[in-house]
Amino acid sequence: MTNRNAITAKLRAVLLLVVLAIMQVQPVFASDKDSITLVNANWQTLYDEDGVQLKSVNCHIFNASQNITVLTFNAREFSMQVGVSDTLIETSRMAESLNADFAINGSFFDFAGPALTFIKKHGRIHPGGASPEQTSRNNWGLVMADSNSRSVKIIPSAYVDMPEKSSACDNVLASYPLLLQGKTICLDSCDYVPNNFNNRNPRSLVAIDSSGNVAFVTIDGRAEGKAMGMTLYEECKMALWLGFTDALNLDGGGSTTLWSRTLGIVNYPSDNKKFDHEGERKVSNILYIKHL
């Protein structure tokens, strides 16, 4: 090999290494840019009273338009409870019937009516929900409200352990998958991930920050140019950027709904295929809060 050929080969090798390095760094830069965009976006405060803050934003992250609504509350000032119905009913109607202040749609359910998950309401396991033996999937999580300590926790749980782990709490809802635990993304441990979890869809989640504040979060979707929705991994990243340490995914898609007694539906439910506040889907369970 001549000196010129040797130099050319070395330059090609160096160029290849540079290209590979750029390919590896670009996602990090994009992620950093998206986090800054989200945090510094023009958030609109919809409600800020009595230990509750409700805010929303429309921004461009993950190379798509996103519409995010976040309700944050102090668990010591509000009682978080589970609402459940044996027949399907809109989140707003169930919340109104329970005299709730705020509510978000809950966990997964069968369109025939019954919940597909473990539910404990006011200290009693709901007989219409799923039994612990019905599934062996891992990476389920429990969101649990303890009225004695006035606290809310999100913990991982093998489905068969749910009654034992929830024994000290009055209101418990199981859902899937657990997104964050101690600021660590938990998706790698999933043994079953439906295809729609990897696609962009409307999402609902419950989350907790390092101070113990609790949040109900909705991510709208299925509205081209206005709200594309997120994959599960994007949902995890968003939750981290918003400062949450623990987070649990709830039922999403057309079920995604966030409701306020004073403002009504504050996100854009997609079941009517329109970008408005009228597209609620009927569900079987919700999470709601009432001022103590």
Model-predicted regions and their roles:
Residues 101-105, 144, 207, 215-217, ...:
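Structural recognition of the beta-strand scaffold that forms the well-ordered cores
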Residues 73-76, 144-151, 183, 208-212, ...:
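Short acidic-glycine loop/turn motifs at beta-strand connectors
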Residues 71, 103-108, 218-221, 250-253:
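Active-site-proximal beta-strand/loop segments in catalytic clefts of secreted hydrolases
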Residues 2-15:
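Bacterial N-terminal signal peptides that target proteins for export
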Residues 168-193:
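Short, conserved active-site entrance elements at the starts or edges of catalytic domains
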Residues 30-146, 151-153:
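Zymogen propeptides
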Residues 113-137, 191-208, 213-245, 255-292:
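Conserved, well-ordered active-site substructure
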Residues 13-24:
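Bacterial N-terminal signal peptides
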